[in-house]
């Protein structure tokens, strides 16, 4: 764990075969990271590297999705094995794999694929990653003892639905298995996309830039902590900086909250570890409320922003997944 006192974890939002055999080991051994996440966009980039060329060329014309799952689950299993000691010691050690984003509107298919991927990898420290559009899928997987990463979280309403789903799934699991380790849940709050979308508008209205994502994340953090599920934590995602005047590790340093996780791109992690960082105080609920009232007063409809970002995020994941299918 990066900061034991604050119970702040840093996870790596990148997986690639050669990286797993080299730099990943160093980050893990030096207690810089203690978890990892993946998504279709990450695998799209990874599979274009030379590490996979021979495997793809000798795949005997497998169906693209079958080949994708072979490559992805191999990488996830390698990652899970490397972090098994962390997991056994209660120091996170989780790695996430996402279900096919094309299934986001099909609860039954999402559940089926989540169970299948979990069984295929067959490691206790794997989290099944599900876009937060299907609450029943989250609760069903957790009830079966499968840890879940609820992703593409933008709005407080999404968070409330996720928390209820995790509560239901946890209760169902606990009723069947007494005195066993509870499956874990993380709620992946996307951060930087708010500012990439709104900074220009904010600047034009003489409002502070680089703040909407932070304040929204802080608001959601309060919701999760107040709900009080011991097996569920806040995970801050989309924390890389693309252009602009912000330093590369801005969204990691600003969101070092107690009992939280930040999953960051490799370049962001490299920037972050150059200088010592300390845990941050979370903005008060009153300050958060005042901030969003100012936004509302300036005719920025945050609810429309929530919907747009979720829609865009789903489209991006589907596009990346479909691009992988074409390339394989």
Model-predicted segments: where are they?
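Structural preference for beta-strand elements that scaffold enzyme active sites
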Residues: 7-11, 34-37, 92-96, 125-129, ...
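N- or domain-start disorder-to-order transition segments that initiate the globular core
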Residues: 1-23
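Active-site beta->alpha loop and helix N-cap motifs at the rims of alpha/beta catalytic domains
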Residues: 42-44, 50-137
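Catalytic beta/alpha-barrel core
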Residues: 13, 72, 124-133, 146-158
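Conserved, mostly hydrophobic/aromatic
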Residues: 39, 97, 128, 141, ...
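Active-site-adjacent beta->alpha loops and helix N-cap segments on the catalytic face
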Residues: 21, 106-111, 130-145, 155-166
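Flexible, acidic glycine-rich loops studded with aromatic residues
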Residues: 230-327
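Catalytic alpha/beta core domains of metabolic enzymes, predominantly
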Residues: 135, 147-267
């Amino acid at each position: 764990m990066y900061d034991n006192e604050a119970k702040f974890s840093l996870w790596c939002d990148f997986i690639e075969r050669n990286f797993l055999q080299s730099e990943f080991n160093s980050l893990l051994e030096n207690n810089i990271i203690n978890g990892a996440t993946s998504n279709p966009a990450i695998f799209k980039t990874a599979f274009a590297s030379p590490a996979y060329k021979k495997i793809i060329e000798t795949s005997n014309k497998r169906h693209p999705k079958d080949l994708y799952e072979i490559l992805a689950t191999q990488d996830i299993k390698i990652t899970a094995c490397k972090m098994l000691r962390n997991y056994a010691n209660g120091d996170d050690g989780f790695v996430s794999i996402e279900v096919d984003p094309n299934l986001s509107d099909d609860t039954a298919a999402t559940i089926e694929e989540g169970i299948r991927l979990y069984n295929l990898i067959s490691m206790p420290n794997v989290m099944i990653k599900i876009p937060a559009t299907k609450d029943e899928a989250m609760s069903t997987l957790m009830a079966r003892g499968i840890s879940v990463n609820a992703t593409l979280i933008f709005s407080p309403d999404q968070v409330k639905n996720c928390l209820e789903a995790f509560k239901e799934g946890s209760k169902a699991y606990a009723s069947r298995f007494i005195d066993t380790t509870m499956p874990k849940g993380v709620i992946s709050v996307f951060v930087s996309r708010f500012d990439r979308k709104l900074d220009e508008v904010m600047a034009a209205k003489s409002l502070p830039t680089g703040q909407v994502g932070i304040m929204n994340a802080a608001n959601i953090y309060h919701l999760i902590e107040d709900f009080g599920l011991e097996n569920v934590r806040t995970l801050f995602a989309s924390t890389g900086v693309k252009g602009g005047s912000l330093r590369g590790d801005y969204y990691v340093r600003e969101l070092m909250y107690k009992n939280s996780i930040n999953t960051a791109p490799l370049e962001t992690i490299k920037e972050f570890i150059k200088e010592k960082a300390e845990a941050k105080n979370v903005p008060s609920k009153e300050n958060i409320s005042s901030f969003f009232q100012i936004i509302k007063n300036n005719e920025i409809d945050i609810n429309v922003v929530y919907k747009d970002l979720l829609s865009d995020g789903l489209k991006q994941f589907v596009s990346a997944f479909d691009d992988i299918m074409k390339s394989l």
